[in-house]
């Protein structure tokens, strides 16, 4: 083999798909698959078969183009080791850094409130329906669960991180297993209800409004934005010095594309399996009861008439336990991000950025009291979870995931080559439609 051929073979090996690329693909995929996925089938199936088919068409473009836009923003900084906050400060100054810190905090903190409501409702429905125990006081249940999680966080954060990381893929496997196991219980109710003469495209329950609201729940459920900055830094340090920024951008796009495909395949299969097992009316009941779809499935199998199979009995209990584990996992993961963001805000505005004025322990205590206290208040109030996602969680995520990168592409010279592309209009539309949910909820 000639020297030229040896060089070509060597370059092909080094620039081809690496083990680290597979690891990050699974990491992005695992970050997105959490408790939010348990509400997607409810919103997607609420309007019947046609809206969920339209959401199926939109799911991959939303997941891929939005996260790729955020990754490109992270890639635009001059420092390969700089995170998104540093990159935004580089482009827009200190004010931009403060804005991104606020956005990150307010994108994650409402998710904790959502998970606080969810875990309270999931535990209470499991206690009353599966264990057949008398109803408990809601405030007491919420306080007990939050204190339990606070205890674990305070005394075993490192162990918690390891356990939560370990639980990611068993949870994904459980979702796939449940989706497959529901196939024998599929029925044609959702198909039978499709009537072309009764179809309505406008109005409160029309297809367009259902899909519009579905976009916000997709932004929420198909979201691995919290890890994109770390992912880009890792890939830049691995590839940029040797192969350049353009190659690194292409590699990041491929990884995001594969992670998005995995995510959409698993979540949409789970959603369709739930919809064919239940019905749009069942999804409406789940929304009214303010519980995740796994808890509703557990109650559904608990009320089955006649002789139940062993599988139905196992699913009745297993679905609730899997839901509880998923919510615990998501709560812990988002708590760490919220704590970091709130610590930064308290330090910046309470102590003028001087780390010598306050200890890390005191910062953590102040932040924990605020986070757990506000989460308990919301959990006790029990607002509708889907309404909270659509009016608060998803719009803030969309502003960070969709609109911030699009604004940067228009204003930052380093991103000028991405201007004028069709996908930019799509990402902007997704962001604006998600934020407009706030207006819709008000009226």
From Swiss-Prot:
GO terms for molecular function: L-serine transmembrane transporter activity; symporter activity; threonine efflux transmembrane transporter activity. It is found in: Cell inner membrane. It catalyses: L-threonine(in) + H(+)(in) = L-threonine(out) + H(+)(out); L-serine(in) + H(+)(in) = L-serine(out) + H(+)(out). Keywords: Amino-acid transport, Cell inner membrane, Cell membrane, Membrane, Symport, Transmembrane, Transmembrane helix, Transport. Its main location: membrane. The chain crosses the membrane at residues 22-42, 44-64, 97-117, 140-160, 163-183, 207-227, 259-279, 319-339, 366-386, 389-409, 423-443. It is a multi-pass membrane protein. The keyword Cell membrane applies. It comes from the Bacteria. One of its GO terms (cellular component) is plasma membrane. The keyword Transmembrane applies. Pfam families: Trp_Tyr_perm (PF03222). Belongs to the amino acid/polyamine transporter 2 family. SdaC/TdcC subfamily. NCBIfam families: PRK13629.1, stp. Involved in the import of threonine and serine into the cell, with the concomitant import of a proton (symport system). This is Threonine/serine transporter TdcC. It comes from Enterobacter sp. (strain 638).
């Amino acid at each position: 083999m000639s020297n030229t051929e040896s060089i070509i073979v060597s370059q092909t090996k080094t620039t081809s798909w690496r083990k680290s690329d597979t690891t990050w693909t699974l990491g992005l995929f695992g970050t997105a698959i959490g408790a939010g996925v348990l509400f997607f089938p409810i919103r997607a199936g609420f309007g019947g078969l046609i809206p969920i088919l339209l959401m199926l068409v939109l799911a991959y473009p939303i997941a891929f183009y939005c996260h790729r836009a955020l990754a490109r923003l992270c890639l635009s900084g001059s420092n390969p080791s700089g995170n998104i906050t540093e990159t935004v400060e580089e482009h827009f100054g200190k004010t931009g850094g403060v804005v991104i810190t606020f956005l990150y905090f307010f994108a994650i903190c409402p998710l904790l409130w959502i998970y606080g409501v969810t875990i309270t409702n999931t535990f209470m429905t499991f206690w009353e329906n599966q264990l057949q125990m008398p109803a408990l006081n809601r405030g007491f249940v919420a306080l007990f669960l939050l204190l339990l999680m606070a205890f674990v966080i305070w005394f075993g954060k490192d162990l918690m991180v390891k356990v939560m990381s370990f639980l990611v893929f068993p949870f994904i496997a459980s979702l796939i297993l449940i989706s497959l196991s529901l196939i024998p219980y599929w029925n044609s109710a959702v198909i039978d209800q499709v009537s072309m003469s009764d179809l309505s495209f406008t109005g409160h329950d029309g297809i367009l409004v259902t899909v519009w609201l579905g976009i916000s729940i997709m932004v929420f459920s198909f979201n691995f934005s919290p890890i994109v900055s770390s992912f880009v830094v890792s890939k830049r340090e691995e590839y940029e010095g040797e192969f350049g920024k353009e190659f690194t951008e292409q590699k990041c796009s491929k990884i995001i594309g594969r992670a998005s495909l995995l995510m959409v395949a698993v979540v949409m299969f789970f959603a369709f399996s739930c919809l064919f097992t239940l019905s749009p009316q069942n999804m409406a009941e789940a929304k009214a009861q303010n519980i995740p779809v796994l808890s509703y499935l557990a109650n559904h199998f608990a009320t089955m008439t006649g002789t139940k199979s062993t599988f139905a009995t196992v699913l009745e209990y297993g679905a609730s336990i899997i839901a509880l584990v998923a919510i615990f996992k998501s709560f812990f993961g988002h708590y760490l991000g919220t704590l970091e963001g709130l610590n930064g805000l308290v330090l910046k505005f309470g102590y003028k950025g001087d780390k010598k004025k306050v200890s890390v322990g005191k910062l953590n205590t102040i932040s924990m009291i605020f986070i757990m206290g506000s989460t308990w208040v919301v959990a006790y109030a029990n607002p509708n979870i889907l309404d909270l996602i659509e009016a608060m969680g998803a719009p803030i995520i969309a502003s960070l995931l969709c609109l911030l990168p699009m604004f940067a592409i228009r204003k930052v010279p380093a991103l000028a080559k991405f201007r004028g592309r069709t996908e930019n209009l799509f990402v902007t539309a997704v962001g604006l439609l998600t934020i407009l949910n706030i207006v819709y909820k008000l009226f």
